[in-house]
């Protein structure tokens, strides 16, 4: 076994990430029960904020939601992010010679994939400021689980 493999088996994810991930499913009027069951997640855990699930179950759910919605952005934005889009974005960024170049590419390309979002990058000497802005409200309330998850997902 490789170093750290025991940690991967015991790693967990807060249930809030599951709630956020499922927000797009619910917005489309779909019941997430089958997706949760297929990933081995007890739906009752969603009612308890302190709940955690295994990282492996979360990863399974993450992939199932993207596949079910045909959207790598999980139905959280007005325009779906078609399968393969994220890989193309990552490849474009990975080919950059510098972090500055990668961030500027991200600022140009992300709005093509997700028109609801803009990114601004400003350099201040050796430091840079990165601003992620929604061009339209992603939800009626700023604390909406889907809106919060959308920003967390994009910032990871």
Which residues are covered by each model-predicted region?
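N-terminal low-complexity or simple alpha-helical regulatory segments
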Residues: 1-131, 145, 153
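Conserved short histidine dyad/triad with adjacent acidic residue
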Residues: 132-138
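Core beta-strand-centered patch of the WYL/Sm-like small regulatory domain
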Residues: 139-156
């Amino acid at each position: 076994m490789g170093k750290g493999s025991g940690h991967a088996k015991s790693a967990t994810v807060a249930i809030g990430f599951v709630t956020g991930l499922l927000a797009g499913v619910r917005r489309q009027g779909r019941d997430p029960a089958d997706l949760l069951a297929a990933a081995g997640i007890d739906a009752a855990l969603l009612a308890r904020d302190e709940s955690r699930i295994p990282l492996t179950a979360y990863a399974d759910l993450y992939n199932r939601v993207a596949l079910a919605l045909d959207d790598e952005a999980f139905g959280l934005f007005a325009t779906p992010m078609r399968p393969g889009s994220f890989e193309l974005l990552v490849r474009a960024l990975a080919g950059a010679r510098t972090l500055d170049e990668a961030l500027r590419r991200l600022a140009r390309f992300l709005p093509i994939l997700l028109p609801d979002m803009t990114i601004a990058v400003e350099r201040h000497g050796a430091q840079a400021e990165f601003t992620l802005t929604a061009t339209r409200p992603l939800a009626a309330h700023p604390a909406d689980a889907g809106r919060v998850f959308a920003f967390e997902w994009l910032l990871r």
